[in-house]
Amino acid sequence: MSDAPFRWPVVLRNGAVVLRPFGRDDEAAYLEIRARNQAWFKPWDATPPPEAGREPYSYADMLRNQQGLAKECRALPWALTWDDGWPSRPARHTRVIGSVGVNGIVWGSSRSAAIGYWIDPAWAGRGLVPMGVAMAVDYCFGRLQLHRLEIDILHENSPSHRVVEKLGFKPDGTRRSLLHINGVWRDHDAYILTADEAPVSLVAKLSGLA
């Protein structure tokens, strides 16, 4: 039993940007984004190594896995979504445009986690990923009282490097053979932010309010 001070589901909002759990109603939108942008995602997507022997992974499998980890307070698997009706008529069901996940949460003396993210390229370049990650960071350092967050990025993924630089994450060397990506074990550049180094609110910083 962890000492995690949250109960899933957790929903975060900053204007039209909403982090919420994926649901069954999101399956068609999720699969459409992934299929339409398969070439875009392929160089960055984690893949099961041959020794894993994993069967095809369905959307329902993903939901079950996410919900299990979240209920055990080991992950915060959010959909990055957009509210088309904000602010005059907030939507009851916001549009999926990507994902921001807090993974591998460790409690006790570590109080650490890793963050990963992706976005539909049709929505890229609007500052939505930095804002979504900032919302997640503020929640982790504020509500959860985590101490250390890590983001690991392939060296050639320039847009992702710009995200962490904008948010103030600091380089922390190379994680050798960290993830199996597109069929190969790949090194990643590591970036770290601790609660001691972070501003009171990354969302406020991005919004020009701090």
Regions found by a protein language model. Give the residues of each.
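Short, contiguous, well-ordered secondary-structure segments
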Residues: 100, 105, 129-139, 155, ...
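Conserved catalytic-core motifs of GNAT/GCN5-like acyltransferases
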Residues: 152, 170-187
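A short coil/beta-turn micro-motif at the C-terminal edge
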Residues: 24, 155-157
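GNAT-family acyltransferases
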Residues: 1-122, 185-210
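Conserved acetyl-CoA-binding loop-helix of GNAT-fold acetyltransferases
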Residues: 118-119, 125-139, 158-166
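Conserved GNAT acetyl-CoA-binding A-motif
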Residues: 143-152
